[in-house]
């Protein structure tokens, strides 16, 4: 959801609470739990999972490896669930022509830098830069060039915007900010 008037443009950024992250977290949790149960059942010699008899899997080396993969998968799954619950990466971009200020806010991981808040003067914005890489792993990212600060990404690398969408977004933002567009 975005909001725009003549003087203010607010763009909300979705963070890690995306459908793909929920799917990967569920798949990883269930798969690693299955691996851990198979490894544990081979150690105990009892069938904890009725689909697979534990006598067919020896604890050394298959059971140990499956238990290791199960534990590693549970750690990665818990990391994904934590990023989803903390909504890491979400926030907003606010461009205020009336005040002449650009504010970029993102939520980070818990700790000292949980809230990432950047503020710039509009007169310090040099350009809007589009970076387009085509090929097997195509990537289209929009950057804001700040004098003395470098480039700040405005879109995520996994947004998968079409060339037309990224061009339109860059043109609208450059027109709103009254800065040129660079293509890299």
Curated annotation (Swiss-Prot):
It holds the Pfam family Ycf4. GO terms for cellular component: chloroplast thylakoid membrane; photosystem I. Keywords: Chloroplast, Membrane, Photosynthesis, Plastid, Thylakoid, Transmembrane, Transmembrane helix. One of its GO terms (biological process) is photosynthesis. It is a multi-pass membrane protein. The chain crosses the membrane at residues 22-42, 57-77. Disulfide bonds: none annotated. InterPro entries: PSI_Ycf4_assembly. It is found in: Plastid, Chloroplast thylakoid membrane. Seems to be required for the assembly of the photosystem I complex. Belongs to the Ycf4 family. This is Photosystem I assembly protein Ycf4.
